[in-house]
Amino acid sequence: MNDPTLLAYIEVEPGRFREDPGLRYEDYVVGHVFEHRPGRTITTTDNIWSSLLCLNQHPLHIDAVYAAETEFHQLLVSSLVTFGIVNGMTVKTISQQAVANLGWDKVRLNAPVFVGDTLYAETRIVDKRPSASRPGEGIVTVHTIGRNQNGVQVIEFDRTLLASMRHPASDPVEEVDALAGGKARS
């Protein structure tokens, strides 16, 4: 079932369309879950270059001989690589139209990731509210889970962002009041 409010294209002239991915504030529905595809297979280059770029020189991530002698018996993908790729997979839908990222919370690394693993992500909308200080924008919180090709959860985190509204209310307090059933001003 397609929701007509989740438009990925805008018609710029008759018969001509432009990609316009990403949710606006009105599109976020608490409880909805978005599966992010395609998956992303982690390569040795991803792991080593990203580890060194971030100055993470732990040999478990960049020295195959060292890693072979550990409990993992192979290079372990840096948690920053895992986080970056899983978070990046969410951008097209969750934050392509965002005004700003406000923060990440409750980051949990649930299982190791290795070169050759393919990661998939899904995001559940947890909360949303109009911004009281920034008319035309709202604050949205989401929970993202990353899984490997076997369905094993490898990472999860909460993320809060500032989202633009398609049709901003003239007074954000009025919108909050309406959402609260007329009780916000009392």
What are the language-model segments listed below?
Residues 2-104, 155, 166-186:
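Hot-dog-fold acyl-thioester-processing enzymes
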Residues 161-165:
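Interdomain boundary/hinge segments at the C-termini of tandem beta-sandwich modules
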Residues 103-148:
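Hydrophobic beta-sheet segments that form the core/acyl-binding groove
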Residues 66-68, 140-160:
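Short peripheral tails and domain-boundary helices/loops at the edges of structured domains
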